[in-house]
Regions:
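N-terminal subdomain of nucleotide-sugar transferases
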Residues: 2-65, 253-255
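Membrane-proximal helix-turn-helix segments that form the acceptor-binding/catalytic region
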Residues: 44, 103-110, 125, 132-133, ...
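A short helix/loop element that forms part of the nucleotide-sugar donor recognition site in Leloir-type
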Residues: 12, 210-224
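Acidic donor-binding loop of glycosyltransferase active sites
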Residues: 301-318, 331
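Conserved acidic donor-binding segment of nucleotide-sugar-dependent glycosyltransferases
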Residues: 347-358, 366-372
Length: 407
């Protein structure tokens, strides 16, 4: 557990509380910090809160890089457990670490006086269960629909467990005071609880100009010729991301536009595509680069060398945070035509295609052949991101949300 400065205690409602109030208690069942979806989103939230002067205590897993922000204290649960990495998605390790959050959470609410609790994902469940003891308002950060995320799991995808998960989700949505969800999930939330106070996250995209030497070095490092077209995917390789669909599409693209290189960044399991015929053929042709997860700062350089950015994601109700980065990069985007993608994309900012390799491949070929059309799409996406997805509007949204939490 993270060490923190001891403060004098007094009594309120029969519980000991600190004489010094911390505004917000954040409970995050995540490895914080790591360069992947939800931890990146959480860091954005914490940075915005810090900039606006909020004091925040974060209860989280023992896994992750240290983060220092003004007003932030981190309390790591389960540090004594022999767990040093947490895979994406459901795992026994994550369940064990979820339970380890409970005693640290209880100690926090007995040691400090908070104005409200901000709980991510499944942490909202035990925060609500224990409400009779803390009586604090809850903002539920619904990064995804848990039943949808686990639909492909061999056990939790079974109908009996899906019904149970949907019951838990429905209960949390209806009991939370406010809900903030990933872009594209609002409609799902309102279908469960029509009167819910729900807001969607629209995260800021970042853009950095790179010197020619930096991009040339990356191309050389990846073994990509200067005149080769580059199609880039970033993110995890879980089944719902549609990476297999992209690999199938890539075969069509390489046949139509020889020399095209597909770069997939975020691979954590080198053997994941060992049985993929498409991956094997692309490797034989020298058209595929599988790259391990990269620091966020380096991802921008990967986007700088790309000619097309792709998101072949299934319709699971929420948008991948990479879309905001894609839009900030100003490169043409090909994405599956799902409600979550349409939360920020339309035909003026991307090519949206059905969930077939043929449609995705055709759109990529079109952009590789018509660079002027690609530039128009990329410029439009970047312009939209600059106007609507900037850091200031995001930080203002955090301030508004937290002001509501204080009421």
């Amino acid at each position: 557990m993270g060490a923190a400065e001891e403060t004098p205690l007094t009594m309120e409602h029969g519980l000991p509380v600190s004489l010094h109030s911390r505004a917000i208690l954040v409970v995050a069942p995540q490895p914080f910090y790591e360069n992947r979806g939800t931890p990146i989103a959480l860091r954005n939230v914490l940075e915005a809160a810090s900039q606006r002067g909020y004091e925040v205590d974060l209860v989280t897993f023992p896994v992750g890089e240290p983060v220092k922000l003004p007003g932030l204290r981190i309390f790591r649960a389960g540090a004594w457990l022999p767990i040093r990495n947490v895979p994406i998605g459901f795992s026994i390790r994550k369940v064990i670490l979820d339970f380890s959050l409970l005693p640290v959470f209880l100690k926090r609410i007995r040691s400090e006086k908070y104005e409200f609790i901000y709980a991510l994902e499944e942490a909202a469940f035990f925060v609500l269960l224990l409400r009779r003891w803390h009586k604090l308002p809850l903002i539920y950060d619904m990064q995804s629909s848990l039943p949808e995320q686990l639909k492909a799991h061999p056990v939790l995808g079974l109908s009996v467990f899906q019904r149970l998960l949907r019951s838990f989700e429905r209960w949390m949505v209806r009991k939370a005071d406010r809900i903030v969800c990933s872009a594209g999930l609002r409609k799902h939330v309102l279908s469960i609880a029509p009167s819910a106070d729900v807001r969607e996250w629209f995260f800021p995209g970042t853009r950095r100009e790179f010197l020619a030497g930096e991009t040339d070095h990356l191309r050389k490092e990846l073994g990509i010729d200067p005149d080769s077209g580059v199609v880039l995917y970033t993110g995890n390789f879980e089944p719902y991301q549609g990476v297999e669909r992209l690999l199938d599409a890539a075969l069509n693209v390489v046949a139509e536009v020889p020399g095209t290189i597909f770069v997939l960044v975020g691979d954590e399991t080198p053997s994941r595509f060992s049985r993929s015929k498409s991956a094997a053929l692309l490797r034989e042709q020298g058209s595929l680069r599988l790259v391990p997860r990269q620091p966020k700062s380096k991802i921008n350089c990967f986007m700088a060398i790309a000619d097309v950015l792709v998101s072949p994601r299934d319709d699971i109700g929420n948008i991948g945070i990479k879309i905001f980065e894609y839009m900030g990069a100003g490169k043409p985007i090909v994405a599956t035509d799902t409600p979550s993608h349409r939360a920020v994309l339309d035909e003026t900012r991307a090519i949206l295609v059905d969930l077939s390799p043929e449609a995705m491949g055709s759109a990529i070929v079109r952009l590789l052949r018509d660079r002027a059309a690609g530039k128009r799409l990329g410029d439009s996406a970047r312009s939209y991101a600059g106007k609507h997805l900037g850091w200031k509007s995001f930080a203002d949204g955090i301030a508004d949300l937290y002001a509501l939490g204080r009421k």
